[in-house]
């Protein structure tokens, strides 16, 4: 019992020795009683102290910052606004330091977080970029100065990739563009020779082989769709080059709209110039007759685009006489012959329909310029001179009964609708039933005398027509020159070459029928480019008669006079005695559309 007591005493004595350090306990109790009063006052006092310290730090920071930037010769004259609030340089400095300094914030793309801490509007789209740029310009140099770092150049920000072409511009422009141009040229050279060889091989198959009808129809459609000056051998290649060079996806990649427009304009301009040069080169070749030459005019492309070309449907193509497509395909590539294409303009009070379908348009070969027929079974010479608008007066034609042409080589065209015309008296003169195959000058003069009686009247331009004839009346024997005569019209006299010097064909301004123009007689209300049409009384008397593929049964000599008036300049007079009836229809109306 004594031992524990001694132990307790020892502990008590030790406790007494240790009591002075533990003496604050009662004071602690007293503090515990007094703490509520001090705790109530401490947050305000501590908050005020912290605010005072922050203000002092902020003030010292701003003073040193402004001083440093002034010494650096980049003074801060005006603090910019960000998010409809003026930037607090102290807050932006503390926010960046809190997120891990400039490099870390830039690497992790945390500038939007810095902007949010500054209290900017949340709808700003350029918040991060603007915050970073303001910090780099106003605060970063001083922060690096405080840390003892050198003023390093700012890290380059990654540019926004607008288009893929930006990668090419980083390197040497010449080194990257030259190989690309060379590759494009090689690719075009590889593509174009194959196409040209295929195009050249298609129109000239072996005589023993029959080309499929589908290929001929496709060639016809392709040649009709491509706008060409002299035929299918001119500009379609240029347009293929244009399309293939521009729409090649691997060439340019994703391009801006402005770059696309510039490239398309350059390519189309170059191709148009090449197309015109090829057209002029082909038109100047001596293959065509010097008398008939396609006039180059600025109106010709417009006329070509406005000219709607129709093709035979597959059913109509199958109804063609047997062997006609074969013989045309066997004819091989022939020189492109000039075909009169243009846009006729009339007086505002007159009506003239645009040019459209003609029997020669039923075949792409004929439209492309193959006017010579194949050698017939009767042993006709292949080297027959190429015919232009027609033959001579002595050559028999398919337009009259006395002709020796017994067959046709193209299918029968459909009849066109004729617009209502002026009323015709019942006692209008009628055409003679038959005509000699080779009429002389006397018959020509008599027809001209008959044709100019009603020339004093104003001729209204009426819609031309095509009448359908029974093909059974014509023989089934094909002949090469017969096709040309059927297509191009009957005998036509020599045409003066001066008629083609203008940009358009002219017509006489008056049809008086006297050796010189009468001074007292008023001229017809036609402009120099107007082509007169059929008179109404002549249209009424022209009945159906045996003819080739629906072409009208007209006297061959009347075409001579009609074409002469079409092709001669407006100043030339009509040297013919006065006549009674006008019976000279114009052949070009067969090529018009209602």
Curated annotation (Swiss-Prot):
UniProt keyword Transcription present: yes
This protein's GO CC annotations: nucleolus; nucleoplasm; nucleus; transcription regulator complex
InterPro entries in UniProt: ARID/SWI1_ChromRemod, ARID_dom, ARID_dom_sf
Modification after translation: Phosphorylated by MAPK14 on serine residues involving a TLR4 signaling pathway upon lipopolysaccharide (LPS) stimulation leading to its ubiquitination and proteasomal degradation.
Pfam families (alphabetical): ARID
Subcellular location field: Nucleus
Domain ARID, chain residue ranges per copy: 55-147
CDD domains recorded: ARID_ARID5A
Annotated crosslink Glycyl lysine isopeptide (Lys-Gly) (interchain with G-Cter in ubiquitin) location: 85, 94
Region (Disordered): 1-56, 146-223, 281-331, 426-454
Biased amino acid composition, Basic and acidic residues: 165-189
Gene Ontology MF term list: chromatin binding; DNA binding; identical protein binding; mRNA 3'-UTR AU-rich region binding; nuclear androgen receptor binding; nuclear estrogen receptor binding; nuclear retinoid X receptor binding; nuclear thyroid hormone receptor binding
Region called Interaction with SOX9, residue ranges: 1-300
Any one of the GO BP annotations: positive regulation of type II interferon production
Keyword annotations: Activator, DNA-binding, Immunity, Innate immunity, Isopeptide bond, Nucleus, Phosphoprotein, Repressor, RNA-binding, Transcription, Transcription regulation, Ubl conjugation
Residue numbers of Phosphoserine PTMs: 23, 256, 289, 438, 463
Polar residues: compositionally biased ranges: 297-306
Assembly mode: Interacts with SOX9. Interacts with ESR1. Interacts with RORC.
Functional note: DNA-binding protein that may regulate transcription and act as a repressor by binding to AT-rich stretches in the promoter region of target genes. May positively regulate chondrocyte-specific transcription such as of COL2A1 in collaboration with SOX9 and positively regulate histone H3 acetylation at chondrocyte-specific genes. May stimulate early-stage chondrocyte differentiation and inhibit later stage differention. Can repress ESR1-mediated transcriptional activation; proposed to act as corepressor for selective nuclear hormone receptors.
PANTHER family in the cross-refs: AT-RICH INTERACTIVE DOMAIN-CONTAINING PROTEIN 5A, RBP-RELATED
Name under which the protein is recorded: AT-rich interactive domain-containing protein 5A
Gene responsible for this protein: ARID5A
């Amino acid at each position: 019992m004594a031992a524990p007591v001694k132990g307790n005493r020892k502990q008590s004595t030790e406790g007494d020795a240790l009591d002075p350090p533990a003496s604050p306990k009662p004071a602690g109790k007293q503090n515990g009683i007094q703490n509520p009063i001090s705790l109530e006052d401490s947050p305000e006092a501590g908050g005020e102290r912290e605010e005072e310290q922050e203000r002092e730090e902020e003030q010292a920071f701003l003073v040193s910052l402004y001083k440093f930037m002034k010494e650096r010769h980049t003074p801060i004259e005006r603090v910019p606004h960000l998010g409809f609030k003026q930037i607090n340089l102290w807050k932006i400095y503390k926010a960046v330091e809190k997120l891990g300094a400039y490099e870390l914030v830039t690497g992790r793309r945390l500038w939007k977080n810095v902007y949010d801490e500054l209290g900017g509007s949340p709808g700003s789209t350029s918040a991060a970029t603007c915050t970073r740029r303001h910090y780099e310009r106003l605060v970063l140099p001083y922060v690096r100065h405080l840390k003892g770092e050198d003023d390093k150049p700012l890290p380059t920000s990654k540019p926004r990739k607008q288009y893929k072409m930006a990668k090419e511009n980083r390197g040497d422009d010449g080194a990257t563009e030259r190989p690309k141009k060379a590759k494009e040229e090689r690719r075009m050279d590889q593509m174009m020779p194959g196409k040209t060889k295929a195009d050249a091989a298609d129109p000239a198959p072996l005589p023993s082989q029959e080309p499929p009808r589908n290929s001929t129809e496709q060639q016809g459609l392709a040649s009709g769709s491509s706008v060409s000056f002299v035929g299918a051998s001119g500009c379609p290649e240029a347009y293929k080059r244009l399309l293939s060079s521009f729409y090649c996806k691997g060439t340019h990649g994703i391009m801006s709209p402005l770059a696309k427009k510039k490239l398309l304009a350059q390519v189309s301009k170059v191709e148009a110039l090449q197309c015109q040069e090829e057209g002029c080169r082909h038109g100047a070749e001596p293959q065509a007759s010097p008398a008939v030459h396609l006039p180059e005019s600025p109106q010709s492309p417009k006329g070509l685009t406005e000219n709607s070309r129709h093709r035979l449907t597959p059913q109509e193509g199958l109804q063609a006489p047997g062997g006609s497509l074969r013989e045309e395909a066997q004819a091989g590539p022939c020189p492109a012959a000039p075909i009169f294409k243009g846009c006729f303009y009339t007086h505002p009070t007159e009506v003239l329909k645009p040019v459209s379908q003609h029997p020669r348009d039923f075949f792409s070969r004929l439209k492309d310029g193959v006017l010579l027929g194949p050698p017939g079974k009767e042993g006709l010479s292949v080297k027959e001179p190429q015919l232009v608008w027609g033959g001579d007066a002595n050559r028999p034609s398919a337009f009259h009964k006395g002709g020796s042409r017994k067959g046709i080589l193209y299918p029968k065209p459909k009849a066109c609708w004729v617009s209502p015309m002026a009323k015709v008296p019942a006692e209008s003169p009628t055409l003679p039933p038959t005509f000699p195959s080779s009429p002389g000058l006397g018959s020509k003069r008599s027809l001209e005398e008959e044709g100019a009686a009603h020339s004093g009247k104003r001729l209204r331009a009426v819609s031309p027509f095509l009448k359908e004839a029974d093909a059974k009346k014509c023989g089934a024997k094909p002949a090469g020159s017969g096709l040309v005569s059927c297509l191009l019209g009957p005998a036509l006299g020599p045409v003066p070459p001066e008629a083609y010097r203008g940009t358009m064909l002219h017509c006489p301004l008056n049809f008086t029928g006297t050796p010189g123009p009468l001074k007292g007689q008023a001229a017809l209300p036609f402009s120099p480019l107007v082509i007169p049409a059929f008179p109404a009384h002549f249209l009424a008397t022209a009945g159906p008669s045996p003819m080739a593929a629906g072409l009208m049964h007209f006297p061959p000599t009347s075409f001579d006079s009609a074409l002469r008036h079409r092709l001669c300049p407006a100043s030339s007079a009509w040297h013919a005695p006065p006549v009674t009836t006008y019976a000279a229809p114009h052949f070009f109306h067969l090529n018009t559309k209602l």
